[in-house]
Amino acid sequence: YGYSASVSPYILNQFEQEVGYKFRPEYIIDQGYYNNQYRVPSKEFRDFQAFQRREVAKLAKEMVDITHACGCEAMMFLGDHWIGTEPFMPEFKTIGLDAVVGSVGNGSTLRLISDIEGVKYTEGRFLPYFFPDTFHEGGDPVREAKENWVTARRAILRKPIDRIGYGGYLKLALQFPEFVDYVESVCNEFRELYENIKGTTPYCVKRVAVLNCWGKMRAWGCHMVHHALYYKQNYSYAGVIEMLSGAPFDVKFISFEDIKNDPHLLDSLDVIINVGDADTAHTGGIWWEDPEISSAIRKFVWNGGGFIGVGEPSGHPYQGHILQLASVLGVEEENGFTLN
């Protein structure tokens, strides 16, 4: 998300003055992992992220103010490097943007855009882009467009974006009239869906929370690598989030820190989902050594709440267990230490 690429002497000096301790390169290098979303974030890195969110928001607001002074709207493209413009964190609203547009690769990426609050409207840039990799002799842009639309449409039915569009070289699209015709049908279908859905609350069967170390900061971006590209290592995990994007659930994303700060947070939930490999930010890692966390989850289940684990939920070697909720899940992972 760009934080590791946003370090400078000026930034480090400002950061040290604010937090009161010296910045160390290891906070960014992170043993060579560079704080990717699968790493359980350290306190120092979270402090750095919070600092960057505040500083970037102030700088971005200056740009937005200039844009507004010229009588124009300010729209941000949600790209690969956010570097502080976290759309689900409170600092984002202070920027004063009018709109956000982003590329739609599937249902998760659509919800990543449509769930953003504090802007007048949101827009999705659908695929394929009008580039030669698809729009060439023998290419099939209609197939890609159909796959993209059908995949994203599920999420639109839960939380619609306000506008849709495509991007690229128009002269390439003109060489495929059947593609242009299909895009027209997509636009008409979107208008019909939007007119019926906008401003309504879709039916929700249950209230579901995805529990990880990031919470709402990575809402709908869990397990997403390079804009919803397929990776064998995380496909099944990302698929859970993709399923939720169009399912009849009231979905929220909570962190272990949220549970610590609000003892009653789980009271409003029906189901908790913990999905990912052991000792990653998505399952919790060292957070499971905190008795308040494990007891809160156990109490939630004891009182009738559901807990769904995918992969190695609560996975962290500690006190004779790999899965810290083994007694709740009814299963434990064998690692060779219990072969007596």
Predicted regions and their residues:
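Polysaccharide-binding and catalytic clefts of secreted carbohydrate-active enzymes
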Residues: 1-97, 103-112, 198
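Active-site clefts of carbohydrate-active enzymes
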Residues: 38-43, 113-143, 173-176, 216
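A short helix->loop->beta-strand "cap" motif at the edges of active sites that frequently abuts
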Residues: 71-72, 119-120, 303-306
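Hydrophobic faces of well-ordered beta-strands that scaffold small-molecule active sites
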Residues: 74-77, 98-102, 120-128, 162-166
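Acidic (Asp/Glu)-rich catalytic clusters
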Residues: 91-94, 110-122, 156-159
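Short, flexible/disordered intra-domain loops and linkers
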Residues: 133-144, 217-232, 280-291, 318-322
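Aromatic-Pro/Gly-enriched surface loop or interdomain linker
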Residues: 153, 159, 181-269
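A glycine-rich, often tryptophan-bearing local segment used as a flexible ligand/cofactor-contacting loop or short
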Residues: 283-340
